[in-house]
């Protein structure tokens, strides 16, 4: 890990390289990473934008832009840059997972389901994609698919606390309260803190 002084020196060095080589995408990218690590997000955006402009194939630059825009709460831009990432690298599973999560937050449920299924097709081990897909099916009032997806998720990752919480929600929406309590309790056992209202509505069924 770079010390603050070392990081500042590295940033200065990359800026110097950038100024000397106006079309050096790698230096722009390295500069963006360092600025991002320092929390200088607006400067990092500029560096990554320059990097992807200089290199039409640098999908990693779009990936990092997506992370920054998510930190800034700009979901439209998260979608925009991750779309560009998967256009460059169509087998980039996490790009589709990122798209799916952004669409889910934007209540664009159909797009979320499509993107998350694509992410899982490319890399079934992205547990968060399964979790978000469970929520997307719930958002789409497809409880059966939410349960099926959630069960696959906890079978693959039995210690994924959030996954058990989401599966509990799916079972609750299907009036299967015993199974909802079972998975909620498992989530709590694994260190998850469920929403107090969810715990309250399940209490009469214990």
Name what the model sees in each region.
Residues 2-16, 38-50, 71-84, 105-118, ...:
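Structural signature of tandem alpha-helical TPR/SEL1-like repeats
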Residues 25-26, 59-60, 93-94, 127-128, ...:
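Helix-start (N-cap) detector for alpha-helical repeat units in TPR-like alpha-solenoids
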Residues 30, 64, 98, 132, ...:
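Canonical tetratricopeptide repeat
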Residues 57-122, 128:
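A generic tandem-repeat structural signature
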Residues 169-173, 193-206:
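TPR/TPR-like alpha-solenoid helical repeat scaffolds
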């Amino acid at each position: 890990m770079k010390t603050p002084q070392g990081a500042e020196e590295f940033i200065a060095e990359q800026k110097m390289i950038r100024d000397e080589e106006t079309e050096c995408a790698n230096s722009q990218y390295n500069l963006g990473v360092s600025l991002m690590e320092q929390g200088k997000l607006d400067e990092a955006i500029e560096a990554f934008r320059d990097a992807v402009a200089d290199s039409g194939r640098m999908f990693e630059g779009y990936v990092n832009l997506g992370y920054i825009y998510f930190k800034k709460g700009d979901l439209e831009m998260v979608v925009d840059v991750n779309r560009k990432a998967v256009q460059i690298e169509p087998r980039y599973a996490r790009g589709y997972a990122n798209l799916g999560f952004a669409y889910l937050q934007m209540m664009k449920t159909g797009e979320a389901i499509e993107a998350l299924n694509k992410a899982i097709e490319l890399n079934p081990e992205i547990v968060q994609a399964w979790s978000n897909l469970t929520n997307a099916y719930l958002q789409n009032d497809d409880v059966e698919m939410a349960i099926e997806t959630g069960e696959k998720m906890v079978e693959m990752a039995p210690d994924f606390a959030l996954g058990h919480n989401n599966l509990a929600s799916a079972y609750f929406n299907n009036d299967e309260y015993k199974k909802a309590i079972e998975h909620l309790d498992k989530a709590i056992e694994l260190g998850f803190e469920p929403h107090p209202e969810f715990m309250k509505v399940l209490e009469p069924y214990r």
